[in-house]
Curated annotation (Swiss-Prot):
Keywords: Cell membrane, Coiled coil, Glycoprotein, Membrane, Nucleus, Phosphoprotein, Signal, Transmembrane, Transmembrane helix. The modification Phosphoserine is found at residue 547. Detected in brain where it is concentrated in cerebellar Purkinje cells (at protein level). Enhances Ca(2+)-mediated inhibition of inositol 1,4,5-triphosphate receptor (ITPR) Ca(2+) release. This is Inositol 1,4,5-trisphosphate receptor-interacting protein. It is found in: Cell membrane; Nucleus outer membrane. The chain crosses the membrane at residues 84-100. Residues 1-15 form the signal peptide. SMART domains: Mab-21. GO terms for cellular component: membrane; nuclear outer membrane; plasma membrane. Interacts with ITPR. It is a single-pass type I membrane protein.
Amino acid sequence: MAMGLFRVCLVVVTAIINHPLLFPRENATVPENEEEIIRKMQAHQEKLQLEQLRLEEEVARLAAEKEALEQVAEEGRQQNETRVAWDLWSTLCMILFLMIEVWRQDHQEGPSPECLGGEEDELPGLGGAPLQGLTLPNKATLGHFYERCIRGATADAARTREFLEGFVDDLLEALRSLCNRDTDMEVEDFIGVDSMYENWQVDRPLLCHLFVPFTPPEPYRFHPELWCSGRSVPLDRQGYGQIKVVRADGDTLSCICGKTKLGEDMLCLLHGRNSMAPPCGDMENLLCATDSLYLDTMQVMKWFQTALTRAWKGIAHKYEFDLAFGQLDSPGSLKIKFRSGKFMPFNLIPVIQCDDSDLYFVSHLPREPSEGTPASSTDWLLSFAVYERHFLRTTLKALPEGACHLSCLQIASFLLSKQSRLTGPSGLSSYHLKTALLHLLLLRQAADWKAGQLDARLHELLCFLEKSLLQKKLHHFFIGNRKVPEAMGLPEAVLRAEPLNLFRPFVLQRSLYRKTLDSFYEMLKNAPALISEYSLHVPSDQPTPKS
């Protein structure tokens, strides 16, 4: 009963509270009439329509701008694609042209009938008239010229070699006696190289080239690093190497004897007294570059010149001539001056043996106009002179008796020497002549070098040189040449190396190339008259007297 009364009272109270007249709401105001409501709704609708039109115009403007940007981007993309396609096409054309050029050089190595008489397809030749149509003297004239003018130099060369070898032996022995074996470089016996020891020297005065190998004091050794041993080197540094000074017995600094000063009565059982490492500041005594472990050519030059000067002072009283340095930029360019006024030049060249081979690193060589200078004083030129001498001697055994190969080289060298004195030196040297001959010896049959074929082989040698000059390409005979007999014993790294172009300087130096080519053709033009003149006149050079 009570619960029922409570519910009735709750309903009544709720109805009173929610009555609109008792508590009116703020937003519950009823408009006065419907027309006012309709007018406001129409005004609001017009505002919405205007806003819609404005938004549609804005959207249309943005769409137009977007379309314009897309069109510009599409045009730029098409231009880029066109440019990339053009660049790619240009690159492909360049590669194609290079491939054609390489193919032309590699496959136009065949002989021309004019140059080689149709023999030996491997031999190089020319596409036009060889030697610009110039003719050399006939076989009889060449033979007479050789007998009258060149053959006599062979006997003079033998006497000169005998005299110089005896003197150099004495000089080097005096040098060794002044050296400290524990701290100074050790000088070995000399090695005769080049034309005087290959029996084709014709130029006067006769000039001997002698290699003088040297080694560092114990416990050090020389470690050569060839350009073809994996290092990345510029093209103009091919054929060079560096020589690192390392310890032959390992690092003794990790031993206590290298860190502690032992007494006079104490000796390390692992490292003797001579194996103790010198102070770091004494690396210059090992002829290394400053703050470097690599041998310095300038340091070697100074050391060798000083050592030779001291050695000569010790034996000068035994001889009736004077000894002086010939060229200041070459460490071993020496000149014997006799009291009669005559002189005898020769070159003592300090060299370092490359491992156990017959390759030698040389600090300096007589300069050729086309030769570059080392970019660094730690760059050493690799010489194949001993291998060249061995190859000529080995080849001679297979050639007919009285073979004309050296006669060809002597005549060509004679003509080049006379032309150089007439017009000045050019980029062509006697070493280029010898390189051309070595290539021909490897390609020609032994029977082609009979004495009676002197004129044909000389003509062929000059044709080879002409083609090489026109192509600006003469490969080094040993580097990268797998046709060299295995019996020569060349290091495998040298045989695997890329061929070295001795005429590469002509590609970079146009003036030198033009001068060399002009000098070569002028030499050919003057050859007949020069040979005829010297066939009737024997030079008045007399053998150099011996002391």
